[in-house]
Amino acid sequence: MNGTEGPNFYIPMSNKTGVVRSPFEYPQYYLAEPWKYSILAAYMFLLILLGFPINFMTLYVTIQHKKLRTPLNYILLNLAFANHFMVLCGFTITLYTSLHGYFVFGQSGCYFEGFFATLGGEIALWSLVALAIERYIVVCKPMSNFRFGENHAMMGVAFTWIMALACAVPPLFGWSRYIPEGMQCSCGVDYYTLKPEINNESFVIYMFVVHFLIPLIIITFCYGRLVCTVKEAAAQQQESATTQKAEKEVTRMVIIMVIFFLICWVPYAYVAFYIFCNQGSEFGPIFMTVPAFFAKSSAIYNPVIYIMLNKQFRNCMITTLCCGKNPFGDDDASSAATSKTEATSVSTSQVSPA
């Protein structure tokens, strides 16, 4: 074996030289130089510096402006809340452990950080699934006389949390476990060992199939059909120009969010699955650290994309930051005309046969 397995950890280095120590008790500078841990700490500080205000303002602006509280935005608000939770409960811990070069909070802290990192990532994934299904229902109209409203949005939010908890909770109760990964400063699901006494192999397979592959299949199907429907509607002029424009804008925003999610999480999923399928193979700590820390940036890009691509939300954000007055002239009064087109007509539109 090219790694060293302990009671609650796995170090990606053989202990033939006798230098391997518990990541809960000793600095792991034999895995990487101290300056590399400093880079990880600086990166986490940057994510906190950006992630906290961005997600907080997303929540605050949505609560402040009634016209933003539409069914579609419930899922986006849920996403911002989960990201905010990740920043406060996960990133701060990882920043502190990176500064010390090992996971100073012990096994309990590892379970705490691993749980919230997994929960936040899964809420983001299932939120994108809910958004894809909502877009598919509204734009593709698979059901006649169906109106997507507040109750459906709340059900979608509840669904994201149920599915995320179904992935993040089992390791807390003995089906798999959370252990330090990579350079041993952050924690995640144990992809490194089979660990039959905790049925680790079955959990990893369950996680990849149910909580990664199936969501991606649903998202791919929904947006594949959606793109075809939007093109057909544009060619046949079946809907008004304003409705088509609103649907295209919201659809573009969500598709970009999905693309960025894949950019952030697919490398991590690929590396984790590779390690799992090649038990005992040789790999350095950086091999898992880079995709794991890169995946954490997902807590920032979704609200940024939403602010950049949604004119109504952008105007509300500027109005809030400028104490109730938009210096660019697109304040609440001037944007009222576009409110229905960009939000209400898309998220709560009556779906009827074409």
Curated annotation (Swiss-Prot):
Low complexity bias locations: 334-354
GO BP field: absorption of visible light; G protein-coupled opsin signaling pathway; visual perception
GO-annotated molecular function: 11-cis retinal binding; G protein-coupled photoreceptor activity
Disulfide bonds: 110-187
Alphabetized Gene3D superfamilies for the sequence: Rhodopsin 7-helix transmembrane proteins
Ranges per topology, Extracellular: 1-36, 97-110, 174-202, 275-286
Modifications the protein undergoes after translation, according to the UniProt entry: Contains one covalently linked retinal chromophore. Upon light absorption, the covalently bound 11-cis-retinal is converted to all-trans-retinal. After hydrolysis of the Schiff base and release of the covalently bound all-trans-retinal, active rhodopsin is regenerated by binding of a fresh molecule of 11-cis-retinal.
GO CC annotation: membrane; photoreceptor disc membrane; plasma membrane
Organism: Rana temporaria
Protein name: Rhodopsin
Residue ranges that the UniProt entry lists as topological domain Cytoplasmic: 62-73, 134-152, 225-252, 309-354
Keywords annotated in UniProt: Cell projection, Chromophore, Disulfide bond, G-protein coupled receptor, Glycoprotein, Lipoprotein, Membrane, Palmitate, Phosphoprotein, Photoreceptor protein, Receptor, Retinal protein, Sensory transduction, Transducer, Transmembrane, Transmembrane helix, Vision
Residues with lipid group (S-palmitoyl cysteine): 322-323
